[in-house]
Each structure stands twice: as structure tokens, then as C-alpha cells.
Amino acid sequence: MPIADMLINEASGHRVITFLDGNAGYNQIFMAEEDISKTAFRCAWFIGLFEWVVMTFGLKNAGATDQRAMNLIFHDLLGVILEVYIDDIVIKSAGLGNHLADLRLNLERMRRYGLKMNPFKCAFGVSAGKFLGFIIHEKGIEIEPKRVEAMKRVEAPTCKKDLQKFLGKVNYLRRFIFNLSGKISSFTPIFRLKDEAEFTWGQNNKSHLRRLRIICLRRQYLRCLREGSLLGFMWLQKIKLLVLF
């Protein structure tokens, strides 16, 4: 499976975007003849046994199989004019003229392989849209509004499971939070408690939770120092060079 963060980065920063969503994408892949019997299921009222001739939802490798099929179909277009995550397709272009050509190339490829999209979930030639839980557009990436609203409704956890749910929501926004691991380190001792140990939520934990919520609700910006100028940087950890731009 592709790395979602990388796809989001590659899909953002373009002026014109088209979003396509597969119409029951799994069902567009035929089952191997020798594996059809493994999908047998029975119905009520003694109707009998039925078998799937197309890939159904819930199979262990269904997602990976769908992604592999899409990679084979769009192998020469991936990372160039489009990005694909299972049955979600983003066609990206610098301008409208280029986008029409890119869109035609993509649709011709889909027609050749018989791919069908859900027209109610598609958006053509727009400037912004939702992809993998984030809003992407020419200027970058934004947090989806409903995730911000979810953070507003967060209450103090009463057990380890509640805390895990909250940190799961925070981790989804990690690209917008500097030094996230350091900001959540105060919660580490709680996760080390044994199941039979009493869950204690102290004043220090409350203040850290409140501070973390404020950070998540604050709009984040990444802006170049001067428009039109080049910017280079190095990212190092101790004396080991990690990234050079």
C-alpha cells in the first residue's frame, strides 16, 4: 500500500484538480476461478449457497489487490499527472489547458480497462477538495473542518482507551504539529500502567491536554520568506545528514 502522507504531499500544490471515486471499486475486480468457492455464503429461508464472482468487501487482501490493479493500470501516470489510493484518484495539473489533456488521458485509460466511477462522488476541474481526510489545493494542505470540530468536543479521558482515542486523533494531524512526540511524552507513564492499576488523571495531565487541544485547533501555516525566491535547508540529527533540499 502507498504511504498516504506522500500521496497527499504530491497531490497538493496544483491549480486545477479532479477527484474521482470508484463505484464499488472492489467489485470491479474478478475473483480467480480457483478461489470463488472460498467466498461462499448462505442465505436465510433455505435459498441456498451463493458465491462471489467479483472481489467482495471484507477479504483480507482486498485493499492491497485493488491498489496493485490500479498501479498496473496507471503505472506510467502515477506521480506525473495523478495519484491513486485504492479507488480514490486525484488528477492534478498546473493549469486548465494541461488539465483537459491530463483528464482525457486518464479517462481513455479507464475506458480501456473498464473502470467505473461514482458520478455523485466525483469533482472535475476544481481548485480544492478532500483527499484522504485532508483538504488539498494550490497553496498546500489544510485540516478537514470536521476533524477540527471533533477536537473541540474532546473531553478529559477516564481510562487508557479514551486517552488512546484522543492521541489517535492528534496523531492524524501530526504534520501540522511541531515536535508532537515531545508534546505527548507526558502521557507515556499512563500507558505503562498495568490493566489492573488505577487510572489517575492529574492536574498536570489536564494542562497538557488543554495545551494540545489549543495547538490542534490553531490554524497552521507554512509560508516561504519571500514569494518567488528559492529556499534551501538542511535537516540534521546530531551529525547525521537526513535531508537536503
Describe the residue ranges of each PLM region.
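Retroelement reverse transcriptase polymerase core
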Residues: M1-F245
